Amino acid sequence: MNVKAMKKILLIAVIALTSVLTASAQKFALLDMEYILKNIPAYERANEQLNQVSKKWQAEVEALNTEAGTMYKNYQNEVVFLSQEQKKSRQDAIMKKEKEASDLKRKYFGPEGELFKKRESLMSPIQEEIYNTVKEIAELRGYSLVLDRASETAGIIFGSPKIDISNEVLQKLGYSN
């Protein structure tokens, strides 16, 4: 086969491939989740509720830590006057108080702690409603992919405002802006 014929075949293959890729072009949309959440009062209320309960629980943990610290200082001041048995008893009490504080901290703030559960119960309905609305808009408009402009992992450098559906999501959720 000569070079001219090979070039023609290659050109036809490239044109065919390009037309196939163009025909299956996907539509994309952007949204700004931070913007959407800031415009949903229920989200702001849930965040405030989480902050209040977090502060309350943190104060409980700090109170136990302070108590353990006070017990330790008292022990340090009186150690020379204590018998071995009294020393052991005080050390055990201090360690018990520190463990109590640590356990309480884990209970409230651990990976499966009360704060996590509270956040899940307050935020899940809001997130689910947003997701369903985004899905509905995407299916209606034929978007194959909707990216979050606010997400650090999305890696969006530029997004045209023409494809940003944030306001439409808010409008469908009943929050006009």
List PLM regions with ranges:
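Positively charged n-region of N-terminal signal peptides that target proteins for export
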Residues: 1-9
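General alpha-helical segment detector with a strong preference for membrane-spanning helices
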Residues: 11-12, 36
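Bacterial N-terminal signal peptides
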Residues: 12-20
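Sec/Tat signal peptide C-region and signal peptidase I cleavage site
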Residues: 21-25
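Amphipathic, charged alpha-helical segments and their helix-to-coil junctions
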Residues: 26-177
